[in-house]
Amino acid sequence: MSKIAVLNEKFEKTSEIELPASYAEVNSHNLYLYVKSYLAGIRANSAHTKGRSDVSGGGKKPWRQKGRGGARAGSTRTNVWVGGAVAFGPKNNRNYDQKVNKKQKRLALEFALNDKVANGKFFAVDSIEISSGKTKDAASIINKLGVRDALIIKNELDAKTLLAFRNLANCYVIDASEVNAYLVSVYSAVIAEKAALQSIVKEG
């Protein structure tokens, strides 16, 4: 059974919290499907080319149909002409969204949480609050844990803590309601307040 290390104010391990046993039974394919859907949902969809109806000009037939000895042409804007349109190019009206069921989203989160805990990269603390709002105080938390980057999960976000972590490229702060499987899996470590962790587990 996966156990979460509970840390004190000095970030020393004091106790452990067990995740529900069912988390260990979740198939990894649920995480794959959710991450695939999440990334598709945030895709920029900016690639766009002009078709024959979008390119200006080319309305006049460039030369007569017969008698020149050359190939016939009806427009100078077909895809075989320089300055012409693109055939079968990408359009920015495409919808890349992929549906994932609510149950599957939950299973993906459970797998991601269990994976972090199993690898000793999930930590629980009573409170994460940077009252000074200073980045150096926020950075010291990450340095004490000795991790490359971290997802910080608070039960309720406060302005000072958000300000302190905002300038750190290797940290991301969210409240418990915003947690998803992608964020948990993409960061090398997760630090959560006990109340936030209870809220996440309770939702399942």
From Swiss-Prot:
GO molecular function: rRNA binding; structural constituent of ribosome
A GO cellular component annotation in the UniProt record: ribonucleoprotein complex
Region (Disordered): 48-75
Pfam families xrefs: Ribosomal_L4
UniProt record, GO biological process: translation
Assembly and binders: Part of the 50S ribosomal subunit.
Annotated protein name in UniProt: Large ribosomal subunit protein uL4
Organism lineage string: Bacteria, Pseudomonadati, Campylobacterota, Epsilonproteobacteria, Campylobacterales
Gene name of the record: rplD
